[in-house]
Structure formats: C-alpha cells, structure tokens
Amino acid sequence: MRGYQRLPLVKGFGRTQRIDNWWNQPIIMAIALGIAMLYTGLRVIMLDGSIHYENHRVTSPIFSPDVLHMFHITNHPGWMNSAMLILWIPFGFRGTCYYMRKVYHRTFFQNPTACMVAKPEINHGVGYSGERGIFIINNIHRYMLYLAIIILSMKYYDVVHTMRFDDSWGFSVGTLILALESFLLTMYVISCHAFRHLFGGSLDQWRGGISSVAGRIFRFSSRHNASHNLWFWTSLAMVFLGDIFVLSVAEGLISDPSFIMG
C-alpha cells in the first residue's frame, strides 16, 4: 500500500503558493452577506412603511407571508410587522444550511480562508472542531426544513393573490417577480441536503408505490444538489430585488403594468 506525502503549506495569514485570485470569492461573499444583513435590518426596523401596494395585492418578499394581514391580527404594537414574526424561519434555515456553513467559516471565521491558503495563527489553537459549542445549533437544520416548506407554500399563495384584481383575474410584473422568487426558493429547498435525505436517507431501494415516488424525488434533488450554491445566491438576491420593486411601486417611483382578463 502506497503512502502519501503531505504538501508543504506556507504559514502566515493569507499566505499561499496559489497563483490564482483565490481571495475574490471570500471577499465577494462577505460583502454580499454583509449588505444583505444590513439591508434587512434597516428595512424591517426602520423602513417598514411600504411593504405592499394595491391593498395588499402584492407584498414584499421580505415581509411575505404577511401573517398579520393574512390572519387579520390588528391588536399588536405599532412597531411590529410580519417580518419580525416569520424571518427567523428563513434565517434559521439558511443560517444552518451546509453551504452557508462553508460560506461563513471561510468569510468571517477564516477557517480556512480557502483551499491551500494559510489561516490566522489563532485558528490553529481554537479552530473548527466539529458541531460543538455554539455550532451545535446547526443540527436544527433538518427541522427548519419543515418550517421553510410551510413558508414556501404560503409564498405561492401570495403569487396567486397577486392575480386577483377586484372582480377579475390577471397578472402583472409583480406577479412575475414573486413567481420567480418562489421558483428560486423552491429550487433552493429542493436541492438542499436535508430535503434530499428526507426522501432517500432511510430507503435502500425504490421498487414501487410510495417508495418509487420517493426515489424519483431523491434523484431529482440529487441532480440539482450540485448547483445548491447557485440556488442559494439567486434566491437570496431575488428576495431583495423583489423588495426593491415593491418598495418602488408603493412609493410611486415606478408602476406595475398589468394584464387583466375580462
């Protein structure tokens, strides 16, 4: 049996023998996540006045589902909004996602910064040692999946709701934007490792009946699992693009062209 040889690694934070622009990815991801968290905080806490338009026909993805309006909850503090009640679910699902763990370990904790790139000296002593301590919370990911599916189904209700114009049906640009957001979120959930395990993790074979359906779902999820990072970023970006669109229409900066069927 042949042995192996450990390749030498240049020591010192960020030092490496790599000649590519390895720092681009962690820097871009750190900036993107930083902007996303800052924008969400400002929108939910300070700029929550325009979260829908046309009497709730179209609601911002950040505040969707608008459970306060949906369930006619009016006896609440004036500063409260639906995002404060439901955002912990998508945040909890995304924050414990396997891909997200890779992102924050590389961008914020620098452990490691990138493949074959030296990490900070302090990380050699207190570096990653498994899902222990505060990181044990990552184990709730499989349970957050169920809650995320509920939220996702309610978002499709919002898409249908955008097609209701008084006594008629139709669609608008807002409908298409929320539909695209819901589709991207669906692909992000379906390509998730936890979703894939849900249908194939406890089965050894798929021969017929329910097990054959589970097998097809498992194979579909496995096929898209390789692009899980793509669905992560595109679905996240669409949440904010959708919010900016709704905010712009609600403030009268742009219009929402619609097509109404008789």
Language model: regions and residue ranges:
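Membrane-embedded alpha-helical bundles that constitute the cytochrome b-like, heme-associated redox core
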Residues: 1-262
